[in-house]
C-alpha cells in the first residue's frame, strides 16, 4: 500500500469518526444540560479540528488520491454548523463569529463551485450550505452578505431545477421565498441603528452615575431567556420568526465600532479568474474571527428560541431552565401567540365578517368583558381570587381547537418560585393579569395594534407592533404614523434617535431616584438589557395613549405589573413632552391628541 493510500484511508477514517460524533451532538436538545452539552461539543470540535489539520498537512497527497474541493467545503460547512449550533445553545458571540468565518471562507473559495459537478448529492450539500449561511448572516446582521447570498442561492435553485428535472426542488423554492419575505419585512429603517445593545445609543452619560449608584435591597442578574412565537403564516426564516429574531437581537451586545469588518463583501464573477483553484486549499483565516470579537463586552444572556413548540414542550423547557437558573438570577420569558384558536391577529378578526371597525370593536369588547366580568371570583382566606388563569389562554397549536394546545396563566404559576420577567404579546395578553404566583415582572401587550394606515396592522406581514416598540422604538413609531425611511436622510433620523436617547436618560434618573419604585422593578434595574426594555415600555405606553382613541384606551394600551411610578406614567408631563418633541421633529404631531 502506497503512502498516498495510507493518507487517504486515514483521512476517510477521520471523516467517519468526526461525522459520527457530529450526529450525536446535532441530536442533543438545545436547552438545558449545560455541562453535558459543553463536554459533547468539546469532543466533536476536537475531532473536526484534528481532521481539518490533517487535510491541511497532507493536502497534496489527498488531492493526488482524488480528494474533491467540495469535500473540504463539506468539512468546513460541518465546522460552521457545529459553531452555529453551539451559539444557539449558549448565545456566546464568539461561536456565531466562528460560524460566519467558516461559511464566508467556503463561499469566497468556492469549494462547491470549483468543479462543475452533475452530482445531485453534492448539489444538495451546496443548497444546505447556502441555507445555513443565510441564517448565520441574518442573525449576525450582515445585510450586504445576505443580499449577495439571496442572489446566489436563487440562481443555484434555478440551476438545479434546470439540470435535475426529475427532482422536485419545491422545498428549496420555499426557502428562497421565506428569506425574501423576511428581508422585505425587516428592511425598513435597517440603517438607523442596530437592534443589539449598543453603548453609543443605549448608554446615557448624564444618567450613568445614577445607574452606577443605584442599588436595590436585592439585585438580580439576567442570565437566561426563553423566546417563542406561534402565529399562523407569520414571517420567518428556518425556525426564527420575525418577532423572536428582533428579541434575540435586542438581548445581545453590539461590538464597538472598531470590531466591525472593514472588508467589503465583494467576490469575483463566476469565472473565478483571480481565485486559485489549482489545489484543494483548506486554509481559513482564523485571525478574522478574533478581529470580530469584542473582548471588552460581558457575555450575552443565554437565549432558548423555541419554534412553534407544543405547550408541554414549552413548559418542559421552562422547567429545565428554572432548575438550572443560578441563585440571585432572573429569567425572561417572551411569549407571542394568539389568544384565540386559529386567529393570529386583528386583521384576521376583521375579515371574519362585518365592517372592519365594528367587527374589531365587537370582538375585542367581548374579550375585554370576558376578562373583566364574566369569570367567577373566589375568596380564599379573605383574598379575592379569579379563575381567569384557567379560563383565558394563549394558543400554541395548528388549526383546530383543543385544550392540549392552550397555555393558561395558571401554567406559569409553578415557575414564579424563581424570579421571572414575563413579556406576553397577544390579543388576549390581559388574561395574564390573573397570574397569582409569586410576584413577577409583567409586560402585557395591547389587545390590538394602532396604526395610521390599518394595512400595517397585519402581524403576518410586519410582526408585532408591541415587540417592535420593545426592540426598535423609533422604527416602531415611524411605522405607526406611516413615516418611511425614504422620507428623510440619516442625519434626520440621528436627531430623532438623540431625542429618544435624551428622554430615556431623563427617565433613568427618575427611576433610579424614585422612592415608590416597586422592588420587582428595582431588583432588575441594574441590568442594561432589562432596564432598556423598561424604558422602551414607558415610551410605547405613552405614545399609544396619545395616539389612540380615549374611548378604547384599554384595548390599545400595554400594561405593566406591578405598576411603575406615576412619574413615568402616560399622563406625566415629562414623558409626554418627550413624545411631543419627537412628533414635532418628524412633523406628525397632528396625529397625537394634546400635542398640537
Range-by-range predicted roles:
Residues 341-474:
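Cysteine protease catalytic core and zymogen-processing segment of caspase-like enzymes
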Residues 244, 251-331, 349-352, 374-375, ...:
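Functional beta-strand-loop-alpha-helix junction segments that form "active/interaction loops"
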Residues 14, 21, 76, 83, ...:
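TPR repeat positional signature
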Residues 51-70, 108-121:
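Flexible helix-coil transition and linker loops at the boundaries of alpha-helical arrays
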Residues 25-30, 80, 85-91, 134, ...:
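Short coil/turn linking the two alpha-helices of tandem helical-hairpin repeats
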Residues 1-50, 56-57:
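N-terminal alpha-helical scaffolding segments that mark the starts
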Residues 98-226, 230, 502-541:
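Cytosolic small-GTPase signaling regions in large eukaryotic proteins
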Residues 420-545:
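Active-site-proximal C-terminal subdomain of hydrolase catalytic domains
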Amino acid at each position: 500500500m502506497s503512502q498516498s493510500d495510507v493518507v487517504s484511508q486515514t483521512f476517510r477514517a477521520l471523516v467517519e469518526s468526526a461525522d459520527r460524533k457530529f450526529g450525536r451532538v446535532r441530536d442533543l436538545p438545545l436547552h438545558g444540560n449545560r455541562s453535558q452539552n459543553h463536554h459533547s461539543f468539546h469532543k466533536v470540535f476536537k475531532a473536526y479540528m484534528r481532521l481539518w489539520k490533517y487535510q491541511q498537512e497532507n493536502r497534496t497527497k489527498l488531492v493526488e488520491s482524488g480528494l474533491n474541493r467540495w469535500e473540504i467545503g463539506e468539512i468546513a460547512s460541518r465546522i460552521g454548523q457545529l459553531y452555529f449550533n453551539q451559539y444557539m445553545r449558549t448565545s456566546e458571540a464568539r461561536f456565531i463569529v466562528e460560524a460566519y468565518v467558516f461559511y464566508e471562507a467556503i463561499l469566497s473559495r468556492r469549494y462547491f463551485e470549483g468543479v462543475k459537478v452533475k452530482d445531485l448529492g453534492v448539489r444538495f450539500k451546496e443548497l444546505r450550505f447556502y441555507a445555513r449561511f443565510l441564517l448565520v448572516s441574518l442573525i449576525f446582521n450582515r445585510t450586504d452578505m445576505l443580499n449577495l447570498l439571496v442572489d446566489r442561492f436563487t440562481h443555484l435553485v434555478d440551476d438545479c431545477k434546470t439540470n435535475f428535472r426529475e427532482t422536485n426542488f419545491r422545498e428549496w423554492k420555499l426557502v428562497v421565498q421565506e428569506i425574501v419575505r423576511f428581508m422585505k419585512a425587516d428592511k425598513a429603517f435597517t440603517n438607523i441603528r442596530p437592534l443589539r445593545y449598543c453603548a453609543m445609543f443605549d448608554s446615557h452619560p448624564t444618567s450613568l452615575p445614577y445607574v452606577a449608584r443605584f442599588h436595590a435591597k436585592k439585585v438580580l442578574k439576567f442570565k437566561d431567556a426563553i423566546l417563542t412565537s406561534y402565529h399562523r403564516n407569520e414571517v420567518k426564516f428556518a425556525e426564527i420568526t420575525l418577532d423572536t429574531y428582533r428579541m434575540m437581537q435586542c438581548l445581545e451586545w453590539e461590538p464597538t465600532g472598531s470590531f466591525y469588518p472593514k472588508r467589503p463583501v465583494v467576490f469575483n464573477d463566476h469565472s473565478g479568474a483571480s481565485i486559485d483553484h489549482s489545489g484543494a486549499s483548506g486554509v481559513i483565516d482564523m485571525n478574522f474571527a478574533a478581529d470580530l470579537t469584542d473582548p471588552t463586552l460581558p457575555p450575552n444572556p443565554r437565549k432558548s428560541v423555541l419554534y412553534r413548540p407544543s405547550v408541554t414542550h414549552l413548559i418542559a423547557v421552562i422547567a429545565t431552565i428554572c432548575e438550572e437558573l443560578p441563585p440571585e438570577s432572573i429569567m425572561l420569558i417572551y411569549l407571542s401567540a394568539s389568544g384565540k384558536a386559529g386567529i393570529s391577529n386583528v386583521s384576521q378578526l376583521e375579515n371574519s365578517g362585518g365592517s372592519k371597525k365594528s367587527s374589531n370593536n365587537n370582538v375585542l369588547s367581548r374579550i375585554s368583558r370576558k376578562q373583566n366580568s364574566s369569570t367567577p371570583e373566589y375568596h380564599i382566606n379573605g383574598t379575592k381570587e379569579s379563575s381567569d388563569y384557567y379560563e383565558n389562554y394563549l394558543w400554541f397549536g395548528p388549526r383546530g381547537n383543543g385544550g392540549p394546545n392552550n397555555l393558561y396563566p395558571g401554567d406559569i404559576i409553578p415557575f414564579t418560585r424563581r424570579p421571572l420577567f414575563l413579556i406576553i404579546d397577544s390579543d388576549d395578553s390581559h388574561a395574564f393579569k390573573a397570574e397569582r404566583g409569586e410576584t413577577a415582572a409583567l409586560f402585557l401587550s395591547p389587545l390590538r395594534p394602532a396604526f395610521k394606515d390599518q394595512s400595517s396592522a397585519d402581524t403576518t406581514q410586519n410582526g408585532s407592533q408591541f415587540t417592535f416598540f420593545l426592540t426598535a422604538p423609533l422604527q416602531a413609531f415611524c411605522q405607526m404614523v406611516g413615516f418611511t425611511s425614504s422620507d428623510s436622510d440619516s442625519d434626520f433620523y440621528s436627531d430623532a434617535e438623540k431625542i429618544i436617547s435624551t428622554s430615556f436618560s431623563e427617565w433613568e434618573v427618575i427611576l433610579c431616584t424614585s422612592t415608590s419604585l416597586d422592588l420587582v422593578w428595582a431588583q432588575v434595574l441594574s441590568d442594561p438589557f432589562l432596564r432598556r426594555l423598561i424604558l422602551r415600555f414607558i415610551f410605547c405606553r405613552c405614545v399609544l395613549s396619545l395616539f389612540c382613541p380615549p374611548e378604547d384606551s384599554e384595548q390599545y394600551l400595554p400594561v405593566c405589573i406591578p405598576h411603575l411610578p406615576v412619574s413615568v406614567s402616560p399622563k406625566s408631563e415629562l414623558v409626554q413632552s418627550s413624545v411631543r418633541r419627537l412628533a414635532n421633529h418628524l412633523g406628525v404631531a397632528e396625529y397625537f391628541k394634546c400635542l398640537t
